[in-house]
Amino acid sequence: MNALNQQYEEKVRPCIDLIDSLRSLGVEKDLALPAIAVIGDQSSGKSSVLEALSGVALPRGSGIVTRCPLELKMKRKNEGEEWYGKITYIGFEENIKDPADVEKKIREAQNKIAGPGSGISEDLISLEIASPDVPDLTLIDLPGIARVAVKGQPENIGDQIKRLIQKFITKQETISLVVVPCNVDIATTEALNMAQRVDPDGERTLGILTKPDLVDKGTEETVVDIVHNEVIHLKKGYMIVKCRGQKEITEKVSLTEAIEREKAFFNDHVFFHTLYNDGHATVPKLAEKLTLELVHHIEKSLPRLEEQIEKKLIETQVELNKYGNGPPPDTSERLGFLIDRVTAFTQDAISLTSGEELKSGVRLNIFSMLRKEFAAWKEMIERSGVTFNWNIEKEVAQYERKYRGRELPGFINYKTFEVMVPGFVNYKTFEGMVKEQIKQLEEPAVLKLKEVAEIVKKELFKVAQNSFVGFPNLMRAAKMMIEAIRKEKEIVAESMLRTQFKMESIVYTQDSTYSKKLGKRKREDLQDGVTGLGTQVKLNTSSTVGNNGTGATLKEMLKHLKSYYQIAGQRLADQIPLVIRYQMLQESAVQLQREMLQMLQDKEKNKVLLHEDSGITNKRIHLQKRLERLSKARLLLTDFSMNIYNFNTTQL
């Protein structure tokens, strides 16, 4: 590590400490942090590399020895300072005084998290090591990829491990450190294949070749070509290391001595000495490379990280606002809290039914729906009018065909005409025809009332759901009240509608109104040159309704009927929606406000109403914790930017 100059050492640690601090805050639950993840097939030499970097023994053996993600935080101390270790997992923290205890502590942690046996878990174990002999570096060690399940392992253990690895290396913030033995075909290794699938251009993948002493004779040049990036290209390139083998571990060769032996191995090797001279070999050179890569990666990721934290803070605050602060613990304050909640709800209900914006910010527009319903009601009246006109004209045409006898054109047999075509001779029969047609609209009007009542109920339910999130009893009480008021107001509105139709049985309009409507229709008919809707009704081959005395009389009476129905229809097109809006919106909202506030008089019931859903309580606590850690993360990033803003690792 002597190659790291003083300036570099001063800047590296803050960068790595920043990310370690963010990870310890739990920020990784909310967004991805820059990291180096170590992956490899089983028996790739992954554990040996990590041991060489950290200076401590890690779990070894056959099968899966890394059963949980292991965050290995290494901090370089000054010469002469004591070794320090600490292990943390799922709320547990323990200091480690002796490096020899590290392996045992990791196994204990894995057994507690993943259970005894060979199962794996996604829960992270954090191991912090501070020593003069380690680099400033943080790595995340992941389980080795198993191809075949052994005794005690689930059949899909390989898939479980791959999913876990995928979870880490898919993130753009993660550098994949792929460990591959020199004595296997690099193209067939599952670890490198996984890295290539998520990083096809090799932008964030670094290859580590291990076990160079086991290379078959004659294949050394292939290994050199791989390290020179000439076989499978990775933009971060390759390193090659020789760690302690099983024989050296059995002989208890120290890590310090192993590093010296490694240096001699590469320096003296016929083929590999060039790799050593180029700085591509040995664990110390690997440590330098990894530290530099991590620092570059952190600095590159910081702007995006700051943006993500700001975005998450806003999203979290917005979501937290939905849940509010929860009921106060002090009994004296709980009534005030309840009154505020109920008042806010009833004000939103009144705003909804009067077409104003809701104070809660929820976007509901009931009038856009009602406008469609009432437009459909008007169209129904108009269609009924068209049918009415057509039926009248049809009856007149039928009379002309069947009942005109010996009379010359211009004469009417009044006895026959009065019997067969009532309504054209006396005013009473005229009234009867109008009443009968209008009566047919009564049930459709009541049906429209029920349809609108259901719409209003559903929209008020939405307001209640938004206003009383987390208070199921209060929400239930509000919904029951909305439903009861709907039924009550629907009965009143229906009575008013039926009264309206009873009044419509009185054929009446102002003389001036009727005269204007009749005059307008006459002018329209004169302009069109046809009767009714502009359709000339054929009576026979020699006469029509419009070209003899009978036709003239009938035509005049048709105009009267159509004119009056148009007036009555317009009156109903306005009056029915007014009744519905008044009762189902305005009166319902006012009564809802009154009854909700009256409900608060019952103090015993208030306790029940303020019972909060435990899920909402937990959600609020979760959001508050997230907000707290993200706020701390933002503060850490701000301090970091202010302290070393002018540092540029590219100059190192």
UniProtKB/Swiss-Prot annotation:
Induction of synthesis: By interferons.
UniProt-annotated stretches for the region G2 motif: 65-67
PROSITE patterns per UniProt: G_DYNAMIN_1, G_DYNAMIN_2, GED
Keywords: Cytoplasm, GTP-binding, Nucleotide-binding
Domain (Dynamin-type G) ranges: 30-303
Matches recorded under PANTHER family: DYNAMIN, INTERFERON-INDUCED GTP-BINDING PROTEIN MX-RELATED
Protein name per UniProt: Interferon-induced GTP-binding protein Mx
The species this protein was found in: Dicentrarchus labrax (European seabass)
